[in-house]
């Protein structure tokens, strides 16, 4: 095994009292092989570690090596956690999609922002959506043999010529063959269609949904997502696309509702779902949480607002059953200003602001807090980008500065953590939360973007203000 391969097999943690712990494997060791064969990736490892008898080759940090014969119960795990979850390089995207958001990014951002992953294995590990265009048949068959489900697929169109055109990839036209093969292995499918007006909507959308319906019970969900366009697009001479307007958004909703009725009658499930942005663009009411049947594609903005609203009501209902919990929090918050009146601003994308404002009435009623939801225009990517998750630090800070200059400024600003890079305290434009706090004249609280996370942040406000007071002294 070469050094490039070995770097993916570094052991990060050994579970206490596990087999690996008992035989002396330690963090920093490298799993070189199992039964003399190198490890292809984490799926290869997971399958082979389940054998009742196996020999593992270990390379130690001091340059020595050892080989250990292990006899154990079949299906018992070794207890090794690797530094690299995938245990291999992540496959990059081989497409040049006409709607690709990464191609519309400005220059000068962090290099990781420009990496386009399209790795089926990441679909299983992290729920990523993949196009299945960069896999040889042998590798596709290997991954299907693990029978991992569901498979999240970026379909966009099922007509071969149209899919090839949209993805600029000659291998993109065989999507239905691959989906049928996956379904034959008992694997469920979540499909995503990024819709571009005049390109893959209208009769092409009907054709795509009709084709996908052939997958039967294994078709779990089909998400219809509007194309996202930034202000940098025109300067790049990219394929000419336009955003959805009210009329075209309503046309897509009508198609979706027609198929929902069809699937409800045939399978007892709606299957086809729309991103919240379609309802907002159309000026129509977003359905209730029960409409989404389990929220299969929240990461695509499908049912996100209904989900957060339901979570918020659930979090408050749970506290109401404790009787004193809300009253105590309300009393502590009232004491923060001395006047009994406390005001918070909640940062949001422009699209969601009105819907979030309606949900926040339960905060006013139960906690006595005045809530102002601030829809922040996206100057960084362009005003056609209206979702909260694509707000940058500089645009949020600009909005906070405006709030601070008001005659009666709010007491604290709440920022959802969906605006941060996953697992980091960094916004998309590389501004850190610490940078923002140091430049803001208003207190800032970053909260977990769930109903429970929001209520927990409210409950913790007295502690935050108390800590800030001590630091100022």
Residues of each region from the PLM?
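PDZ-domain C-terminal substructure recognizer with occasional recognition of PDZ-binding tails
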Residues: 46-82
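Radical SAM enzyme core and accessory elements
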Residues: 1-4, 10, 283-473
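Flexible glycine/acidic-rich beta-alpha junction loops that bind and position SAM and/or redox cofactors
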Residues: 199, 219-247, 267-290, 378-384, ...
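Short, structured beta-strand/loop micro-motifs enriched in basic residues and often containing a Trp
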Residues: 7-16, 36-39
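Conserved PDZ fold ligand-binding element
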Residues: 20-40
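Hydrophobic anchor at the start of a short beta-strand
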Residues: 189, 219-220, 371, 444
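Structural preference for beta-strand elements that scaffold enzyme active sites
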Residues: 150-152, 188-190, 221-223, 271-273, ...
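Conserved Radical SAM active-site core
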Residues: 64, 72-218, 228-258
């Amino acid at each position: 095994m070469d050094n490039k391969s070995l770097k993916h097999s570094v052991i990060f943690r050994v579970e206490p009292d596990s087999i690996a712990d008992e035989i002396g494997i330690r963090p920093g060791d490298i799993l070189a092989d199992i039964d003399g064969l190198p490890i292809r990736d984490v799926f290869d490892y997971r399958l082979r570690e389940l054998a009742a008898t196996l020999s593992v080759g270990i390379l130690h940090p001091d340059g020595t090596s050892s080989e250990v014969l292990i006899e154990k119960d079949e299906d018992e795990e070794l207890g090794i956690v690797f530094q690299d979850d995938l245990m291999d390089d992540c496959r990059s995207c081989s497409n040049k999609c006409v709607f690709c958001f990464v191609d519309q990014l400005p220059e000068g951002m962090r290099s990781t922002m420009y990496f386009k992953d399209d790795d089926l294995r990441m679909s299983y590990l992290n729920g990523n959506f993949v196009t299945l265009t960069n896999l040889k048949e042998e590798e596709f068959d290997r991954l299907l043999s693990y029978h991992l489900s569901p498979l999240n697929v970026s379909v966009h169109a099922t007509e071969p010529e149209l899919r090839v055109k949209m993805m600029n990839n000659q291998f993109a036209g065989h999507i239905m063959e691959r989906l049928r093969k996956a379904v034959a292995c008992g694997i469920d499918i979540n499909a995503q269609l990024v819709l571009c007006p005049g390109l893959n909507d209208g009769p092409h959308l009907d054709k795509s949904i009709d084709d996908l319906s052939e997958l039967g019970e294994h078709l779990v969900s089909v998400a219809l997502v509007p194309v996202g366009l930034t202000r940098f697009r025109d300067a790049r001479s990219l394929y000419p696309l336009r955003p959805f307007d009210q009329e075209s958004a309503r046309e897509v909703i009508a198609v979706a509702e027609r198929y929902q009725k069809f699937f409800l009658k045939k399978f007892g499930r709606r299957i086809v779902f729309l991103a919240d942005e379609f309802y907002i663009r159309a000026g129509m009411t977003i359905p209730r949480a029960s409409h989404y049947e389990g929220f299969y594609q929240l990461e695509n903005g499908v049912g996100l607002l209904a989900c957060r609203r339901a979570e918020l009501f659930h979090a408050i209902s749970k506290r109401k059953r404790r009787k004193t919990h809300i009253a105590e929090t309300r009393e502590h918050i009232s004491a923060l200003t001395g006047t009994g009146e406390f005001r918070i601003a909640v940062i949001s994308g422009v699209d969601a602001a009105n819907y979030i404002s309606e949900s926040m009435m339960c905060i006013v009623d139960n906690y006595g807090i005045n809530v102002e939801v601030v829809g922040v225009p996206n100057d960084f990517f362009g005003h056609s980008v209206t979702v909260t998750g694509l707000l940058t630090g500089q645009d949020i800070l600009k909005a906070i500065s405006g709030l601070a200059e008001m005659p009666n400024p709010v007491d604290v600003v709440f920022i959802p953590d969906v605006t941060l890079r996953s697992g980091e305290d960094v916004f998309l434009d590389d501004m850190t939360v610490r940078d923002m706090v140091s430049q803001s004249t208003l207190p800032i609280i970053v909260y977990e973007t769930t109903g429970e996370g929001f209520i927990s942040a409210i409950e913790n406000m007295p502690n935050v203000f108390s800590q800030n007071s001590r630091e100022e002294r």
